[in-house]
């Protein structure tokens, strides 16, 4: 990882979901690649006041643990996320097995608490083939995400397993 261009670390998620759904008054298209972001050095630096280079080193030291697939459990929250450039996505928030314990170890090694990321999977986009929208801190969730109402959330969650 180059500290001048810190890399986000992710693990892939395999889900059998439809290529197109209708929810929240729009048609949405499946993302070609599904993942959970586990570690974003630049956003963690801003949220924790830790040095980005120290976070990059910690990410490298724990890369295998941060990028290996883990069990996830969708928690029932689904949100529409909007970027300033007009892109829109649908995300399902999830719990990630063992990520809290890993973050405790990372925090101990860095000598400061690291906030857990708001773990989620970006499932669909408003434009076919569009990328995701950064959602790696609670502040970004508050600024960019709007929870779907129960009926629309159920329409999305109906395609997801409780545990992946």
Where do the PLM segments sit?
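Histidine-dependent nucleotide/RNA phosphoesterase domain, centered on the 2H-phosphoesterase fold
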Residues: 1-164
């Amino acid at each position: 990882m180059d500290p001048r261009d810190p890399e986000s670390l992710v693990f892939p998620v395999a889900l059998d979901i439809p290529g197109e759904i209708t929810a929240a008054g729009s048609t949405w298209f499946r993302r070609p690649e599904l993942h959970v972001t586990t570690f974003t050095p630049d956003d963690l630096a801003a949220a924790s006041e830790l040095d980005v280079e120290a976070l990059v080193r910690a990410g490298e030291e724990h890369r295998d643990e941060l990028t290996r697939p883990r069990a996830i459990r969708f928690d029932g929250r689904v949100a529409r996320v909007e970027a300033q450039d007009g892109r829109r996505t649908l995300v399902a928030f999830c719990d990630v097995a063992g990520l809290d314990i890993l973050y405790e170890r990372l925090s101990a090694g860095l000598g400061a608490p690291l906030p857990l990321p708001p773990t989620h999977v970006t499932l669909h986009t408003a434009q076919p083939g569009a990328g995701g929208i950064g959602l790696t801190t609670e502040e970004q969730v508050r600024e960019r995400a709007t929870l779907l109402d129960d009926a629309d959330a159920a329409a999305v969650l109906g395609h997801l397993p409780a545990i992946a």
